[in-house]
Structure formats: structure tokens, C-alpha cells
Amino acid sequence: MDLINSSTHVINVSTSLTNSTGVPTPAPKTIIAASLFMAFIIGVISNGLYLWMLQFKMQRTVNTLLFFHLILSYFISTLILPFMATSFLQDNHWVFGSVLCKAFNSTLSVSMFASVFFLSAISVARYYLILHPVWSQQHRTPHWASRIALQIWISATILSIPYLVFRTTHDDHKGRIKCQNNYIVSTDWESKEHQTLGQWIHAACFVGRFLLGFLLPFLVIIFCYKRVATKMKEKGLFKSSKPFKVMVTAVISFFVCWMPYHVHSGLVLTKSQPLPLHLTLGLAVVTISFNTVVSPVLYLFTGENFKVFKKSILALFNSTFSDISSTERTQTLNSETEI
């Protein structure tokens, strides 16, 4: 993740705006750090509760397994947030050493890719359940979901290797140690030839991260949920608005939470003007914090009427994270047989 590396831009933005306009702008680092600490506290408690419920209080199904790993990726992300917040508060000064610089940022990258891939896997699993029910009944099992989860974690780890290679600490000769990407892979940071090579490597990493970590998964999610919604409507499987709400929530939350981060990464790559960098960084921090903390809550409360929560939190979890009802599954199988 490049958010730690980008805080230098925020500090420079505040200074340059103050010098050019004479009007001091509030330093956003305190607000950003406070948001990260708040997200950490809420995220650890809420995601920890979700993991406990999904693991010990619910039936082991494809949906609950995939949601468990999705929320596990959110939980891992929240554990890194205090270290990011500390770096922001110290003007991007990294005090945790080179090894943790690599470890924390590669871990954030793994959890980012994993969360995106699990959201895609959930949409694909529902696609097969509704459009190919016979195949799903034979092959869509908890064991199948476990293998998918393992493949996702391995893929996310492989795609995060660049952070282990390029992430390093660097002395800026101003009394600060920065944890940032060194795409030059050299101690000669000032060499023009090395900087050109580093720019190309940076661009390749950005394109790969944008395509594999946002655009392609987003298209997969839209395609799957569009086909699922159409099929369920045709076969009269929409007994309530619950499935539709969950689908819409998945698409909207995915786009809103991740688009600002990739926009900011693109602006950093193109060395955009300070103000857009300043604004998109703050927005990216807020939306990513929102994603790790609030997205599971959105799934929960769009899954069933809020009144159910007053009766039983477990019933609410079951209505949200379990597969479609046996009646709906039977109707789908019958429809498939007729076809």
C-alpha cells in the first residue's frame, strides 16, 4: 500500500498552500491518524465478533466460509492501522525498522488483494448457485470453497511480492527515516538513469495493481450479480428485496471504497499537482478505513430487516451470510430440470 509513502505529499501540500496564499491550511495528518486509530479500535472489535460468529455459531457452508476469509482480510488490515497512524503523526518518520517496513506493507497488500478476490469469489459462487444449480449441488461444497480460499491467499501473496522487493527505509537527510518504495532497487537514488528505470517499474506495478486489484474484479462482480438478478427475477426467486440489496451493496461499496485509492496512486505516478494529491489521499484513507470497518456492517443490515437484530443477532447473521433458502434452491433446480 502506498498511503504511508504518500503522507510526505500531504505535508508538502500544507506548506506550499500556506506559503502561496498566506492562509494556513489545517494539517490533515492529525485527522488522518485519528481516523486510522478509530478504524483500528472499531475494526478489531466488530470484525473479531464477525469472525467468531462465522467460525463457531454458524453452519459451515460455501457462503460462510468465503465471508469468513473476506472478513479475516479486513481484520488483518485493521491490525496494521496503528503503525500507519503513528507514521502520519511523526511526519512520515518510520521508527519500526526496515524489516517491519517490508512486512507491514506487504501484509496490507495481501489483505487488499485478498479482500477484492473474495468479494469476486462470493459473486461467482452465487452466479453458479443460481445459473448452474445442478453443477453447484454436485461440486459447490465447503471443501471446494476452502480450496478457493487457499488459492486466493496464495495469489494475493504472490501479487504482493513487489512490496517485499521494493519497499525499504530511506534516510531523507532531514532527520527522518521514510518507509517507501524504491523502484530503482539501488542506493543511488539520485541517478537519472536509475530514476527513469524506477518510473517504468512504478508504472508497471500501478497498472498491474489497478487491473488485477480493481478493474477486472469489479467487472466480474457486476457481470455475476447482473446475471443472478436477471435469473432470479425470471424464475420468481425474489421473495423479498434482501438478495437485491446485498448485491447492490456489494457493487457500490466495492467501487466507493477502492476507487479513491487507485485514483490517488495514479496521481502519485504522474506527479500531479499537490492539491489533488492532498485531497485524494485523505479520501483514500477514509474510504479504506470505511471498507475494513463498515462494509461488514452494511452486508449485515442489508441482509435482513433491522427488526430481526432486536430478536436475535445470530438470526441476522444466518439471514445474511448463509446460502439462499432450500425452497429457493429447489425452485431453481426444478427450473433447470425443465430447461
UniProtKB/Swiss-Prot annotation:
Tissue: Expressed predominantly in lung, spleen and testis.
Glycosylation sites: 5, 12, 19
One Gene Ontology term, aspect cellular component: plasma membrane
Compartment list: Cell membrane
Record-level Gene Ontology MF annotations: G protein-coupled receptor activity
Chief location category: membrane
Disulphide connectivity of cysteines: 101-179
UniProtKB keywords: Cell membrane, Disulfide bond, G-protein coupled receptor, Glycoprotein, Membrane, Receptor, Transducer, Transmembrane, Transmembrane helix
Transmembrane segments: 31-53, 65-86, 104-124, 144-165, 210-230, 247-268, 284-303
Record carries keyword Transport: no
Residues in compartment: Cytoplasmic: 54-64, 125-143, 231-246, 304-339
Membrane topology: Multi-pass membrane protein
Record topology, Extracellular segments: 1-30, 87-103, 166-209, 269-283
The family this protein is said to belong to: Belongs to the G-protein coupled receptor 1 family.
PANTHER family associated with the record: CHEMOTACTIC RECEPTOR (PTHR24225), G-PROTEIN COUPLED RECEPTOR 33-RELATED (PTHR24225:SF5)
Annotated function: Orphan receptor; could be a chemoattractant receptor.
Name assigned to this protein: Probable G-protein coupled receptor 33
